[in-house]
Structures are given as structure tokens and as C-alpha cells.
């Protein structure tokens, strides 16, 4: 059968919080089968726990932010979430000693390295997938996000549309089937991006204090300000796809479906996930006893790092 996955051992890393600009330590710990993905604020006494869920996301203005009923928050979970989703992790305790996950270099690549360095092991319990049964679509103006039935894995098709000389039509769309290999080699290094005018405004109101050219792509009216340029020619749309993978994994399960989006962001991604889960006819839990019947990316030999 396709089994659940966790880490072989605990691991930690220290970085900077995107909004606070302060040091943050992230610790990832193995968890027993059927625990799920659980975030924890360990700087509070007692520690506050956040099981992964679509409903826990209550702020999507600048990132994907979990907030509980007492107003306790953990921000910027999407890049770590995307890394966990791509590696098929099911059970993990994510501890952080601040209100946000460290931004690292603005991509998911440092989290991939951290997870693989700790090692991934299978557990003696069947892995649950969410399989899409009916098409669900959400819209906001000209923006939209949609999930259609597709049982072979998670298919992704993302389009951005920015009026900027550095964002030409040939770098606005990207398509990919989610697997560890595709994620690591094709999109994991894609960094978050922003515009200089937005950075100046955010920092004036005390946000994005940890943002810099070391952890984001910054564009002015005409060019990219980062001296090293882009890591991929289509890095911007690839990062938006990376974000969507992390946002959809807030349900705590790998999804089998066909996701497509136009100008979507954290808010619309979460709105789609909530709409899917609210419609009991739109999805179902499935497990796979026969590894040969498993979705793409989860078959024996396709995840060679286990």
C-alpha cells in the first residue's frame, strides 16, 4: 500500500521573519501516523497548536496566515507547506518561536533541503488522498481558480497577468504535474516577488521589515532590481504556482485533481479549498493498497529519497 510519511528525525533552522525582521527558529519534528500536519507557537506559554485546515487561514492579504479564536497567528506558512506537499509528508509537528515562519531566500528550496536532510520514512498506515469528484470554481472579478476531477495526481496550470516590461506573455503561464522531482527541479527555487512601490508602503506601516533583495525579487517600473536576475525566465509564475501548492495543502492531505488558475492569490486559493471541502459531493478520501495503482509521483521508485 501507499503509506503515510513523516521525518526520520527532528531538524531545525534559523532565519528572519519577513514582516518582523527578527530572528525566527523553525523546528520540524516527526509525528505518529494519523497526526497530520500540526503547527505550533512554542514561544507562548503554554504552546499554541494549529492543526492544518482551510478554516484556520483567516488572513491572506500578504501571505497565508493561520489565526486561532484567540487571535494567535502563524504567518507565511505557504512555502514550507508547498515543500511538505511535494514530498508527500503526512505527519509533522512544525514548531516556530515567533508569529511567522522564516522567509529564508523567499523560495521553498531551503525547506526541501531541510526536510531531505532530516530524512523521510514511511509509516505503517495507509496514506489518505483527497480525490476530486466534481468541478469547483471560484471567481473574484476577472480572477478565478478551478479544480476539476483528475485521478492520476495533481495537475497544475497557472497564469499571471502583470503589465510590466519584464513580464512578457511567454513567461506568464506554467503547467506541471506535481511530483517531488518536478517540484524540486522546476519550481522549488522560484522566489516571492514584489514591486518597489509596495515595499516602500509596507515598510512605512511596519510590515515587510525583513524583506530584502536576499529573499525576494523586487521590480521597479522598468526592471528587476536583483543584480543576479532571475533563477528561471518564468520565475514569477512558477512562484505563484508554488504558493498555490502550499495553499491547497492547508487541508493536510495531498489532492488528486486538475487545478487551474488565472491571476489567483492566497485569498482565492483558500476560497477554492474551502468551497471544495464544503461540498461533500465534490471530493472523497481514497487510499491505495496496490502501489501500481497509485497516483503519479507516489509509486514505488519515484520517491528515491525514502
Swiss-Prot record:
The keyword Lipid biosynthesis applies. This is UDP-3-O-acyl-N-acetylglucosamine deacetylase. GO terms for cellular component: membrane. The keyword Hydrolase applies. Its cofactor is Zn(2+). It comes from Actinobacillus pleuropneumoniae serotype 3 (strain JL03). GO terms for molecular function: metal ion binding; UDP-3-O-acyl-N-acetylglucosamine deacetylase activity. The lineage of its organism: Bacteria, Pseudomonadati, Pseudomonadota, Gammaproteobacteria, Pasteurellales. Belongs to the LpxC family.
